[in-house]
Amino acid sequence: MITPFPVAFVLLCFLNSFLLETEVKADESTQPEFFPLKGLQILTEMNPTQTEDGWEIVEGDIVLPPGSRRKQDKHQETKGIINILTLWTNGKVSYNFHSSVDDDLKEMIVGAMKEWETHTCLKFNEKALDFNYIRFRADKEGCWSMIGRINSIFAGQDVSIGDRCNRTNIIVHEIGHAIGLYHEQSRNDRDGYIHINWHNMPVARYSQFDRGIESPRGVEYDYTSVMQYGPMAFTEKYFQKNTIAALNPFHQTLIGSGMKISFRDSKLVNKMYSCSAFCPNNASQCQNGGFLSPYRGDNQPCHCVCQPGSSGEFCENINDPYEYYEFPPCGGNITSDAEIETPNYPTRKPPVDNCAWWIQAEEGKRVKVEFMDFSFHPRLDKNDSFFYRRCYHERVEIRTRNRYDGDMFCGEDIPPGTVATSAGREFIIIIDTNEQVMEGRGLKAKVSFIDEKAEQLSDLVLTSLLPTL
């Protein structure tokens, strides 16, 4: 049978996609390119490994202050810092702009700060000079920040919004670091939510996925956090292999999709800065994971901020069944013979985009899939591009060997009549796209189940269809 998703699908991201410009440093001849991906998909190669002053940059965009060493700092690498001395006093953050920041970028930075002010008790004040302050600048390479308030003593601490970083959600992300947030994928409890495909990255990059020691103040992991990197972070093969996989395949396309501050981002920062401490009703108990809104200094009671899927004065009402995340608009869990296809097949119409089919065989069986049609946006045909012949625009990840790692297909890679089987009891198909790049007819396939001792075809068939890059 096929278990359908809820009919009502609301995109978690209020923007469907953005174009992130990147340059791959491994190839000096590579020209800056645009590629369409959802949310925070920072290609970690766009940043240097150290600042021009020689300060180390870890996890892609976190600057370690002089005198600190990565291993020494790991004791406080949760999602939110635990050392109150690195929090901004009373939630007041002073800042100014370096002369390299033009008016358009200033407007974006101010907008990003307002996002944090709207959802927390933080206040950003522009000052030419202060004991501690943030200096936004655009003359450095890459997007990066230090974590929390650094005791700079009138010298200021830089937040770099360099070339290719002028995207609001990237700026929100870097400000997140400056107010004390680490990356979501660095949380100590991350293994309960994501799987790291170590074999898809160079050994030298393993340290980029070091974990912290403790969980961040009881706030659950969030795939849609503005602090979560995309699924290909630090991969050796962009648009071919993921490094981060959701334990639940239905959540895969949510990873790094955050276009704005999520509920759990705001909840964590409000806890870090004790934003409800002065609420007249701070003894009020919000239910079902809700929290009191930040106190605004007006002697008015604070209200409960309810997480997605709940409502009411005290968040007492919850949807049945309750889901924090919305599921992909198409796909489902398949446990018996079925025929699957993308919505509106053989055409593709917005706004439906991502799909996920999690096909599971019973004990003693394996999954068999016959592809009747496979038609998506072609592989990139710019032979001067680093991403030449890769699934640059949209991709269909097919996992036949295990739950967390597969190969990416697109165009008409899979001819009609192609038959593939799973190595074990699971066969997963995940379509990652958006309405701006959808092309082709989509996908249509027959699903059936065979004895586990039958011939295994997955590696012989699907892998052989991948082009040599």
Task: Identify the function of each model-found stretch.
Residues V93-D102, A155-G162, F250-G256, D353, ...:
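Short interface patches used for recognition in eukaryotic signaling and trafficking proteins
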Residues L105-A112, R167-I171, Y223, D265, ...:
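Alpha-helical interaction elements in eukaryotic regulators
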Residues C165, R190-V305, S311-D320:
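Metalloprotease/metallohydrolase-associated module, dominated by Zn2+-dependent proteases
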Residues V110-E117, V172, H177, Q228, ...:
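Amphipathic alpha-helical interaction motifs in eukaryotic regulatory proteins
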Residues T3-A8, F278-L469:
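Domain-level representation of secreted and single-pass membrane ectodomains enriched
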Residues P66-L87, F97-F234, G364, E370:
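Metzincin-family zinc-dependent endopeptidase catalytic domain
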Residues F9, C13-L105, G111-K114, T120, ...:
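Disordered inhibitory propeptide/activation segment of secreted metzincin zinc metalloprotease zymogens
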Residues G91, T118-T120, D130-N132, A155, ...:
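Residues that flank catalytic or metal-binding motifs in active/ligand-binding sites
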